[in-house]
Each structure stands twice: as C-alpha cells, then as structure tokens.
Amino acid sequence: MSNRITTDFQFNIGENKLKDFKAFVSKMTETTALNEPNTLVYEWHINASGNEGHLLETFTDSEAFLTHFDNVGHMFDELFTYATITRAKIYGATSDELKQSLDPLGVEYFEHFNGITR
C-alpha cells in the first residue's frame, strides 16, 4: 500500500478573472516546482468555458503535503480573490496534522482500500 496522497480541488473562476487566475496560478506552480521535490504531480486544468478549474496533486506522503502547504498556504487569500473552492477531495492516508491544516477548506477524505500504484 502506498503512502501517496492525491487531491482534486475544483474551483469556480470568477467572472472576468480568468487572466488573473492563470497568472497567479503560474506563480504558485513556480513556487511548487522550485521548492518541493516530493510533490510528484501539480497540475491545473481549466474547462473550455474558462469558468471552472481543477487542481490535481500527488504527494509522496503527508509530510510532503504539509511542506507544500507551508510553501503556498500564504498565497491562498489572493487565489481566492480569483476563484472559490467548490469541491475538495483528498485520496490516501492523511495524517491528523495534515487534516487539521486542510479541514478549514471543507475537504472530503477518502482512504485507500484496494488497488495498485506503480
């Protein structure tokens, strides 16, 4: 069984905010890429209408996710001026410490019970 944690955060992007949203997300991506070797996946996706975005992430474990949270958590206030979270799902074995950090975001947790990771 893997210790990896995967996320799917869904956002509604504010009207006339797409350009600013994309620019700000680029800053978050750069911060993540430069400082987090244990963040395995950090991908933003936007629908064709430009009003919904998804952030997909995979971390080696809870500690890697906490490191990510420390690196970009201070950026959330600005992110939320461009978009609001409409769904937050976390898949995998999350530590109690990580849950305390994520609970204010209204996260729904899913524990791994079967499958393979390669």
Language-model-detected regions and their locations in the chain:
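Short S/T/G/P-rich N-terminal loop/turn motif that feeds into the first structured element of a domain
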Residues: 1-53, 60-71, 81-118
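A short, acidic, amphipathic alpha-helical segment used as a generic capping/interface helix at domain edges
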Residues: 73-77
